[in-house]
C-alpha cells in the first residue's frame, strides 16, 4: 500500500497511539474525546485509497419533506466527482427514507419483511437518480443493486464493484444487503468490508456523534473521537450496533460528518471542519 501506511493512517486504521493524540483528550484514561474544536484527521488523500460513503435518503431531500431535491443531488454529485479526481475510489450506499422506510411501514401494519423489501426498492430509485447526477458532472458512475433489476442497473457482485472502482467509476450501491431486517448502515459496513475499503464515511445532518440527539437535547456533547467498542457500549444511535460491530471486526474506521454543506465529503477526507472519527480499539 506504499504511502498509505503513514503514521496517521495507522492510528485511524489500527488504533495505534490513537487515544493520547486527541485534541484536548483524556490520553489513555479510557474516556471518549469531546470538544468543540475541529477534529484533525489524516491530512493526505493517500491515507484513504478506497472509501464507502453512506448517504441516507433524507440527505437527498434538501429542504423538501420527501422525494429528491435536484440541487442537493447536484451538490453531492459534484463533491463525489472531486473525491474521484483525487484518485480515491468511492462507493456510495444510499438509503431510501425519503420515499419509504421499512420500519415505519411495519409500524403501520405492513409485514416487516415486505416493508423492508419496499424500502429496498426506494434505495434503487435514489441510486439511479444519484448515478445520473454524477454522470451529469462528467464523472463515470455505475449503479449496482443487491436486488437484481437487469432492465435498470447491474446486479451487485463483489467482482463487478471492484472492476468499476478500478476503472475510476463511482459505484452507487442500491438494495441494501438484499435482505430484510438489515439497515443500509449495516449494508455500508458490509460493503466496506467486502470491498476492502479503508474508510466508512457516514453522512448525516449533524457534525458528528453526540451523546444524545442535539436537535432535542441542547446539552448533548459531541465526541471528537471514539472507539468502535465505546460507540457500541454507549448505544450511540448514529449507526446501528450491527454496523459498528462489522466495522470493528474488520478494522475499518468511520468518519461521521454533516453532509449539509457544499464540499462536505471532500472536507471530511481532508480533515477540515468538525466530525467524529470512530476507530478500532
Mark where each language-model region is.
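Short Gly/Ser/Thr- and charged-rich N-terminal loops/segments
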Residues: 23-25
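C-terminal catalytic "cap/lid" subdomain
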Residues: 4, 12-18, 34-281
Amino acid at each position: 500500500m506504499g504511502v498509505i501506511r503513514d503514521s496517521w493512517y495507522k492510528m485511524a486504521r489500527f488504533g495505534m497511539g490513537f487515544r493520547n493524540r486527541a485534541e484536548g483528550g483524556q490520553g489513555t484514561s479510557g474516556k471518549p474525546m469531546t470538544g468543540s474544536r475541529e477534529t484533525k484527521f489524516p491530512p493526505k488523500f493517500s491515507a484513504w485509497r478506497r472509501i464507502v460513503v453512506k448517504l441516507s435518503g433524507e440527505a437527498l431531500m434538501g429542504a423538501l419533506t420527501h422525494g429528491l431535491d435536484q440541487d442537493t443531488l447536484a451538490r453531492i454529485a459534484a463533491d463525489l466527482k472531486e473525491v474521484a479526481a483525487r484518485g480515491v475510489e468511492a462507493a456510495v450506499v444510499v438509503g431510501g427514507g425519503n420515499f419509504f422506510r421499512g420500519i415505519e411501514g411495519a409500524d403501520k401494519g405492513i409485514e416487516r419483511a415486505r416493508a423492508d423489501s419496499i424500502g429496498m426498492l426506494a434505495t434503487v430509485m435514489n441510486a439511479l437518480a444519484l448515478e445520473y447526477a454524477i454522470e451529469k458532472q462528467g464523472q463515470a458512475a455505475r449503479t449496482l443493486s443487491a436486488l437484481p433489476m437487469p432492465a435498470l442497473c447491474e446486479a451487485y457482485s463483489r467482482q463487478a464493484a471492484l472492476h468499476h472502482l478500478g476503472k475510476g467509476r463511482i459505484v452507487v450501491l442500491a438494495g441494501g444487503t438484499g435482505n430484510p431486517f438489515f439497515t443500509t448502515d449495516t449494508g455500508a459496513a458490509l460493503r466496506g468490508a467486502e470491498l476492502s475499503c479503508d474508510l466508512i464515511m457516514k453522512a448525516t445532518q449533524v457534525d458528528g456523534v453526540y451523546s444524545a440527539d442535539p436537535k432535542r437535547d441542547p446539552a448533548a456533547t459531541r465526541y471528537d473521537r471514539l472507539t468502535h467498542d465505546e460507540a457500541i457500549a454507549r448505544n450511540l444511535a448514529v449507526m446501528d450496533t450491527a454496523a459498528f460491530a462489522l466495522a470493528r471486526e474488520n478494522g475499518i474506521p468511520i468518519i461521521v460528518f454533516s453532509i449539509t454543506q457544499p464540499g462536505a465529503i471532500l472536507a471530511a477526507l481532508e480533515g477540515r471542519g468538525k466530525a467524529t472519527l470512530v476507530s478500532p480499539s
